[in-house]
Amino acid sequence: MEDFIYYNGKKYRKGYTTGTCAAAAAKACVEMILTQEEVSAVQVTTTGGTILEIPVAYQKFSKDKATAAVQKDGGDDIDATHGMWIFVDIDLTDNAEVVLDGGVGIGRATQKGISVAVGEAAINPAPRKNILATVRESLGENRGAKILVYAPEGEERAKRTMNSNLGIIGGISILGTTGIVTPMSDEGWKKSLSMELEMKRNQGLDQIILVPGNYGDDFVQNTLGFSSGNIVSMSNFVGYMLKETQRLAFKKVLMVGHFGKLVKVSAGIFTTYSKDADARAEILVANLALLGAPLSLLQAVEKCNTTEAAGELIEEAGFTQVYEVIAQKIKARSERFLKFTKPSVEIDVVTFSTERGLLAATKDIDVLREEWR
């Protein structure tokens, strides 16, 4: 696929999704059955309406059956499914019905709350509709087919995805809102996080714990002793996920994260990628100065490369109250971020250090334990 975007001055090639791969393989199967000839490439219309020519990596056919595979090409976006083969088997039937299922390496939904019913193959609604429409268009109105999508590497590749968090077990998902993979785009990642949040809400939860990543998850479960069932990753998308909690009408949010990540939010930085915004030292220095810290401490903290290193100096100087001040500012900034939209969301914050453990919380920890048990 020769389509490009530019990001930070660099040129990146776009790719296509697992859903587009499955639709292309399905079309190749139908064409081989109807023509009794091998097909090396097919034209498909993606879920977003883009017409692509997709190479077919594997072909096998007989009078009423065919198998085809398309190799997933994510362009310059090297995700968990890049390079794997997506297979489709098609068997023609005597009735006019076209049915679709997933086989080996395609996950199955085991929990309510996502767009796939419990027990069904993890083929999302948009690619499902596209695969069925592609086959129907190629096959005509009067013939039927059984379509099986499978991916021999799927179970292993799925370990690198968020599927297990969503209750999708046994393989990858067939995805693709537009059918196109855009390199350096965070949209797919954010959508996955939103799906997990929606699943929790649909299961009846009205309060949620947001963590930036594994450190936060581990601290919530093993230090605070809270249930893992309330935890959802927000990654670097703090603002986006806060807006999502409001959209989904969660009543309470508890943000738990390493101080070096959450400190940015106290200054209104709601996307915490270090490449986009890093003001950790500046925020610490400003707040220490407001507490009356000596110039020597401010200068030393400013030179620190990490908040862990700064923490050692802050502790030695006796200014650990700065953590409580900043935790309250994280809470205030976050609630102000959601202030002008309804419904209101109550937010609390817990920050920690890998070396020093709990640093600060906006409520007494025992009170939080009672609220979140």
UniProtKB/Swiss-Prot annotation:
Family classification: Belongs to the CbiD family.
Catalytic activity line of the entry: Co-precorrin-5B + S-adenosyl-L-methionine = Co-precorrin-6A + S-adenosyl-L-homocysteine
Gene that specifies this protein: cbiD
Name of one Pfam family that matches: CbiD
Pathway, per record: Cofactor biosynthesis; adenosylcobalamin biosynthesis; cob(II)yrinate a,c-diamide from sirohydrochlorin (anaerobic route): step 6/10
Superkingdom as given in the UniProt entry: Bacteria
Keyword annotations from UniProtKB, A to Z: Cobalamin biosynthesis, Methyltransferase, S-adenosyl-L-methionine, Transferase
One of the GO biological process terms: anaerobic cobalamin biosynthetic process
InterPro entries according to UniProt: CbiD, CbiD_sf
MF terms (GO), sorted A to Z: cobalt-precorrin-5B C1-methyltransferase activity
Record flagged with keyword S-adenosyl-L-methionine: yes
EC number: 2.1.1.195
Keyword hit for S-adenosyl-L-methionine: yes
Name under which the protein is recorded: Cobalt-precorrin-5B C(1)-methyltransferase
